[in-house]
Design a protein with these regions (language model features):
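Buried hydrophobic-core signal for structured, non-transmembrane domains
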Residues: 28-34, 78, 95-100, 152-157
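Solvent-exposed coil/turn segments that connect beta secondary-structure elements
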Residues: 35, 48-50, 73, 79-83, ...
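Beta-sheet-dominated interaction scaffolds and their linkers
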Residues: 10-33, 134-148
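Terminal connector regions
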Residues: 83-132, 136, 199-232
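N-terminal signal peptide c-region/cleavage motif recognized by signal peptidases
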Residues: 5-7
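Short acidic, flexible loop segments centered on an aromatic residue
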Residues: 36-53, 158-175
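Intrinsically disordered, low-complexity Pro/Gly/Ser/Thr-rich segments with frequent PxxP/GP/PP motifs
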Residues: 52-85, 174-201
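A mid-sequence, solvent-exposed acidic-amphipathic segment
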Residues: 136-172
């Protein structure tokens, strides 16, 4: 089985790259689409906790399995359970929504060997407590605290939200060699390496609630400072 994070090579794809589940809601929905114009597929959905353990004790994906005809669309609802009241109320909790596409069985009358690959899409699902309410246009990601020592950046997240840093480069033309996306949990700290680049000027990009990449400039001449880059 092949697991991918965005479903880019899958016949059946979700309509987003992340889900924010507000605790005041009973459920949240996403749309899935069978992009094949020839074959029907089954779509098998489930939820995993932060450790990657399958569980429906807190959140349930419904229906767990459904059939999509060629070029058809459908919905998956993620429904909260009563036990979600046990989740922390002062910070987000991370889950994963998983969807595995199941192709139709090959034609047994064919003389040709057929390799079937079950592709699995996996996207982040953030449970957001009722006490956490972002104001319109609020950019909590700019509260990220950064310090530099040589070719290492320390990223400290003082907020109650998960911060996903998906871009780090000298400019907007490409990431630093070897850089991989970093997710900083609420009230935690992680380190990332800048490789052979030891300068103090960076472009740093984070993912917003809708999965869009938002760019900032990072100036570490003295104390590191983040500043949003206005969209062109």
């Amino acid at each position: 089985m092949l697991t991918i994070s965005l479903g880019c090579n899958a016949a059946v794809q979700p309509d987003r790259t992340r889900i924010v589940f507000n605790a005041n809601d009973k459920a949240t929905s996403l749309r899935i689409e069978n992009q094949s114009d020839k074959l029907p597929y089954l779509a098998y959905s489930w939820i995993e906790n932060e450790k990657g353990e399958k569980s429906d004790a807190l959140l349930v994906a419904l229906p767990p399995i459904q059939r999509l005809e060629p070029k058809a669309t459908s919905q998956v609802r993620v429904v909260k359970q009563a036990s979600t009241t046990q989740l922390p109320g002062d910070r987000e909790t991370l889950f994963f929504y998983n969807m595995r596409e199941i192709p139709p069985a090959p034609d047994k009358s064919s003389d040709h060997a057929i390799l079937q690959v079950a592709i699995q899409s996996r996207i982040k699902l953030f449970w957001r407590p009722a006490a956490l309410r972002k104001k319109a246009g609020e950019k909590v990601e700019l509260q990220l605290q950064v310090s530099q020592q040589g070719n290492q950046l320390t990223l400290k997240n003082p907020t109650a939200y998960y911060l996903t840093i998906a871009y780090l480069g000298r400019n907007e033309k490409g990431v630093l060699p070897g850089f991989k996306t970093v997710m900083v949990a609420p009230f935690s700290t992680v380190n990332t390496n800048t490789g052979s680049y030891s300068g103090s000027q960076f472009y740093l990009g984070y993912m917003d609630d809708y999965g869009a990449l938002r760019m900032t400039t990072l100036n570490c001449s003295g104390q590191c400072r983040l500043q949003a880059v206005e969209a062109k």
